[in-house]
Amino acid sequence: MAKKSMIERNLRRIKLCDQYKEKREKLKSIINNKNLSIVERFTAQNKLIKKLPRNSSKTKIRNRCALTGRPRGVYRKFGLCRIVLRDLCSFGQIPGVTKSSW
């Protein structure tokens, strides 16, 4: 089980990412627009770096297990780590998932 502080930190990052998503997209579109002058693009890049919080970036978010908070071995489709997924599948808790045999 992950520390509660790590899970809470990740949740705060998700909220910040959602909050600043539109601003970040606008600034990135200005930065990537080749038709604008270099000065305008540079000022937009400075705003992106200095004005927005560092944790509002999408790359800071970590995929974690919904039940245990484990950061590694998480299946995106289920939102669960491999250990919990195996346990739930073996008990038949996840519909449509069967043990394969060949």
UniProtKB/Swiss-Prot annotation:
<dbReference type="GO" id="GO:0015935">
    <property type="term" value="C:small ribosomal subunit"/>
</dbReference>
<dbReference type="InterPro" id="IPR001209">
    <property type="entry name" value="Ribosomal_uS14"/>
</dbReference>
<dbReference type="GO" id="GO:0019843">
    <property type="term" value="F:rRNA binding"/>
</dbReference>
<dbReference type="GO" id="GO:0003735">
    <property type="term" value="F:structural constituent of ribosome"/>
</dbReference>
<dbReference type="GO" id="GO:0005737">
    <property type="term" value="C:cytoplasm"/>
</dbReference>
<dbReference type="Pfam" id="PF00253">
    <property type="entry name" value="Ribosomal_S14"/>
</dbReference>
<comment type="function">
    <text>Binds 16S rRNA, required for the assembly of 30S particles and may also be responsible for determining the conformation of the 16S rRNA at the A site.</text>
</comment>
<dbReference type="InterPro" id="IPR023036">
    <property type="entry name" value="Ribosomal_uS14_bac/plastid"/>
</dbReference>
<protein>
    <recommendedName>
        <fullName>Small ribosomal subunit protein uS14</fullName>
    </recommendedName>
</protein>
<keyword id="KW-0689">Ribosomal protein</keyword>
<comment type="similarity">
    <text>Belongs to the universal ribosomal protein uS14 family.</text>
</comment>
<comment type="subunit">
    <text>Part of the 30S ribosomal subunit. Contacts proteins S3 and S10.</text>
</comment>
<keyword id="KW-0694">RNA-binding</keyword>
<keyword id="KW-0687">Ribonucleoprotein</keyword>
<keyword id="KW-0699">rRNA-binding</keyword>
<dbReference type="GO" id="GO:0006412">
    <property type="term" value="P:translation"/>
</dbReference>
<dbReference type="InterPro" id="IPR018271">
    <property type="entry name" value="Ribosomal_uS14_CS"/>
</dbReference>
